[in-house]
A protein has these predicted regions:
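Nudix hydrolase/Nudix homology domain
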Residues: 22, 27-30, 95-155
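Active-site-adjacent beta-strand/loop module that shapes the phosphate/pyrophosphate-binding cleft
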Residues: 70-103, 116
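Functional cleft and adjacent loop/helix regions within the main domain
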Residues: 33, 39, 79-81, 150-155
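A generic fold-level signal
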Residues: 2-4, 13, 84-87, 110
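Short, hydrophobic/aromatic-rich beta-strand segments within well-structured domains
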Residues: 10, 19-21, 90-94
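Short connector loops at helix/strand junctions that flank enzyme active sites
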Residues: 4, 25-27, 32, 85-89
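Conserved N-terminal beta-strand and adjoining loop/helix that marks the start
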Residues: 1-18, 39
Length: 155
């Protein structure tokens, strides 16, 4: 299999802003909570697990509004991870039903160092590695019609 099956969570608060998280291993790199599916795991089960692991939200704190995918991207030439040459994400739009304060990215061994809420059109594609930019552009356009996406660097 070329692409690793994966899920990503676009968490939207009541005002319409979406949650983005800054990677712990790369300052200035922002993304949605995401992760690979384990063997035999369904996309919804993977989503619930990843949201709990990465931002500490239990299943009753959000509703699933929409899912689309897969959106694929390839790793740079010559790179494989866990035997895969890329990832295929199903993106879930989640509506936050609990207070925003429940979102927690500061647990020990956390994948993220911080989080913030932005309007979808404020997402700067330069926050991502080049391999992910096309997929994120499509996701944001498909989910939000965000046509004024920012990109401060070339790519």
């Amino acid at each position: 299999m070329l692409y690793r099956p994966a899920v990503a969570a676009i968490l939207q608060n009541r005002s319409g802003r979406i949650l983005i998280c800054e990677r712990a291993d790369a300052a200035g790199a922002w993304q949605f909570p995401q992760g690979g599916m384990e063997d035999g795991e369904t996309p919804i089960a993977a989503l619930i697990r990843e949201v709990l692991e990465e931002i500490s939200l239990p299943r009753n704190a959000y509703s699933i509004a929409w899912v689309r995918g897969p959106y694929r991207y390839r790793f740079p030439a010559g790179i494989t991870k866990k035997g895969f040459r890329g990832q295929a994400h199903h993106y879930f739009l989640l509506r936050l039903r609990a207070p925003k304060s429940l979102v927690n990215v500061g647990s020990p061994n956390a994948e993220f160092r911080s989080a913030r809420w932005i309007w979808p059109e404020e997402f700067d594609l330069a926050w991502l590695p080049p391999m992910k930019r096309r997929a994120y552009r499509r996701v944001l356009q498909d989910f939000f019609g965000a046509t004024a996406l920012i990109q401060t660097n070339s790519g």
